[in-house]
């Protein structure tokens, strides 16, 4: 059975880009007769906005979304992540990293998603002294291509050794890294389809590699076009994207429908009816492959 999900982070309030992802993931799930889950990705408490999680849920309800089951909170799932890391330790796939970011980034080359880790701590004899600090934990990556067929973008691939390097699963400050948490959650929740923004496309080969290491199914992925402002920047909390105005729910839904190339919806003042209409007319093949300007 199709199981999709929407996984916001409570570092801020929902904005127009969030709404596009919510609509697309919801419409794709419901159009396939599937489930749509909500998962709150609250992995980084220092960056979270107080009250954002409850505000996000209230906003989704106000826009007519109905999800299946209880909301999952990553902050309550640490035991699952610890179990997942233990499996990788047992398989000999991970190692402690004693490097500070400043140390390992000095002289490092840039890859697909920031600097490529140079593998300094792969070999025990080369690891610097801990000096009383906890290590991060990294996973060894293979020198081979990992690719997949995306439902919107098409073919996408990376050589993890060349483009990414061994990446962190547990940070030195004790917080779980996104890549491990999302793979563990998707597997445990039975997620079969992931519809999300293209800013996460670069993360997908890492997640597929983790799925292979853990012998869990790889979901089908579809990465949506990013919404950009007039300066070509992705609308996000960092670019001061305005929070969704609950007094303009119908207008904002229609705006998102246009970005997703849905036909014009009939007049109604009920957001839930607009969502039902989007489900009935959903066509992933019409979704643009490239960024869309949303002034």
Curated annotation (Swiss-Prot):
This is Glutamyl-Q tRNA(Asp) synthetase. ATP binds at residue 237. The keyword Metal-binding applies. Its cofactor is Zn(2+). It comes from Neisseria meningitidis serogroup B (strain ATCC BAA-335 / MC58). A motif ('HIGH' region) lies at residues 8-18. Belongs to the class-I aminoacyl-tRNA synthetase family. GluQ subfamily. Keywords: Aminoacyl-tRNA synthetase, ATP-binding, Ligase, Metal-binding, Nucleotide-binding, Zinc. The keyword Transmembrane helix does not apply.
């Amino acid at each position: 059975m199709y199981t999709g999900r929407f996984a916001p982070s409570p570092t801020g309030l929902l904005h127009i880009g969030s709404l596009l992802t919510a609509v697309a993931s919801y419409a794709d799930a419901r159009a396939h007769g599937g489930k749509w889950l909500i998962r709150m990705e609250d992995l980084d408490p220092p960056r979270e906005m107080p009250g954002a999680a409850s505000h996000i849920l209230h906003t989704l309800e106000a826009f007519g979304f109905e999800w299946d089951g209880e909301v999952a909170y990553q902050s309550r799932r640490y035991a699952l992540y610890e179990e997942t890391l233990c499996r990788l330790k047992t398989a000999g796939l991970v190692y402690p990293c004693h490097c500070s970011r400043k140390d390992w980034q000095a002289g490092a080359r840039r890859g697909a998603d920031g600097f490529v880790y140079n593998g300094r701590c792969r070999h025990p004899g080369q690891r610097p002294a801990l000096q009383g600090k906890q290590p991060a934990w990294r996973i060894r990556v293979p020198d081979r291509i990992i690719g997949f067929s995306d439902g919107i973008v098409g073919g996408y691939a990376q050589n993890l050794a060349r483009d990414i390097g061994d990446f962190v699963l547990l940070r030195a400050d004790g917080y779980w890294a996104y890549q491990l948490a999302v793979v563990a959650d998707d597997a445990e929740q039975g997620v079969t389809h992931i519809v999300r923004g293209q800013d996460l496309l670069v993360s997908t080969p890492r997640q597929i590699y983790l799925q292979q290491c853990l012998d869990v199914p790889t979901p089908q992925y579809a990465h949506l076009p990013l919404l950009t402002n007039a300066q070509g920047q992705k609308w996000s909390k960092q670019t001061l994207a305005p929070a969704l105005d609950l007094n303009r729910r119908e207008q904002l839904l229609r705006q998102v429908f246009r970005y997703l190339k849905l036909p014009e919806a009939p007049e109604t003042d009920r957001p839930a009816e607009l969502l039902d209409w989007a489900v009935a007319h959903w066509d992933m093949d019409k979704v643009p492959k490239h960024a869309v300007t949303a002034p």
